Amino acid sequence: MRNTRALRTYGLFVALTLVVVSSPPAARTSAGTAEPAAPLAVLISCDGEVTVLRKGGVVKGAFGLPLEAGDEIRTGAQAQAEILFDNGNYVSLGAGSAMQVKGSKHEAASSTKPMGDNGFEVAQNFLKLKSPEGTSSIAALRSGRKEAELHALSPQRTRVLSTRPTFVWEFGSPEEELQITIYGENGILWRHTLVGVSQLTYPDAAPPLTPGATYSWTVETTDPLRVPPLRSNAAFFEVITVEEQSKLGVALEKIGDGAASAQSQHVMRASVFFAYNLLDDAVKETEQALALAPENTTLQSILARLYAESGRTDRAAETYGRILDKQ
């Protein structure tokens, strides 16, 4: 290994291991479905001329590229790469560097004990969103979707961290009065009328939301002359439990302790949120990662899938459409 910046083994995935061990409800593997073997490492950041020498030739380095034993990663004169190994170790390669992936478990020169496979699995599950599987349906939205005049955006098909979530919607007539309704297991929990806004944070004075419980919400017009009233889709969400929230806090803090690039930290945070089905939070982190690498089509594909999974089909179609336009 030459001109390689000092190997740093951070506590990035110590807490992630705890996350996965607790069997989060967002597990993505279907029963009876064989999963391909996980790679030994993955490129989580790739800037400039990065190449991977492997059996069969040379592969251009790219975000999310899986790495196997024998692969040699090389960076150009003004390039850098960040690699996450299956034992939780993290390596940053500076310009003009090279490193080879070795062994069934990469044994990096570090005094820190390996973290295990679970945290790596969290990141791998997130990166699987780049797969073209399912993108055909997103592409179909590009030409076949109908614009909803009143649409509940967030939270939708997701879990939330706070018992005071912020509800966000789209409406073509912002001057018209709306009514937002929150439903619990026993029916209507809270209602409120508003005008001229497209979001509302659940107030302290409203009936409290219970961690672990599932809720739904809608917005609709109140004008008696509009018959029938215009009503949004019903959006569902679940409040995460106190125990899970505590574990997540530790996981996110550990990621912040590392010296990974800002883009990589956003990707890692998004991976944790995705593992717990906190899709809105995963979307926000992926958006921030993409803002730092706007031409990263892999991140664009992941974001499109996250939009689709969280019910934001218009944004999914727009994002995927931009990918198709570049092809």
Give the positions of each predicted feature.
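Glycine- and acidic-residue-biased ligand/ion/polar-headgroup-sensing regions
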Residues: G32-G57, R74-A81, D86-N89, A95-G134
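Long, contiguous interaction/recruitment modules in multidomain scaffold/adaptor proteins
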Residues: I138-A260
